[in-house]
Amino acid sequence: MTQIKIKRVYEEPADTDGYRVLVDRLWPRGMKKEYLKYDVWEKDITPSPDLRKWFHGDIAGHWKEFAAMYEKELEGSAAAVKEFLTKIASYKVVTLLYASKEPVYNHARILQQYLEIHLK
């Protein structure tokens, strides 16, 4: 079964990262494209621009509502999610890369949990 991990894009890559997936809609601030080691950039399973902007207005305060709204967006993007799950099914480890400074309140954590549920 595939193990899904999350990691900031600014952390050093490791051999244990496996298949590295950038899961931010926007390119990480200050990161040159030639320096980021990633296998694929999956914009279609990231929060919509409006949801992302709203969430960043009050990260901790909006967390629970954001999580529910993002999961609803993922359900609305079932084809993209299914395609991604098919893509990662053959990998033992997949690392979702995110740029946020916030290690707890970030969309990658929600996406990780959502994907783990739907991989089964």
Question: Where in the sequence are the language-model features?
Answer:
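Residues lining hydrophobic/aromatic ligand-binding pockets adjacent to catalytic sites
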Residues: M1-K120
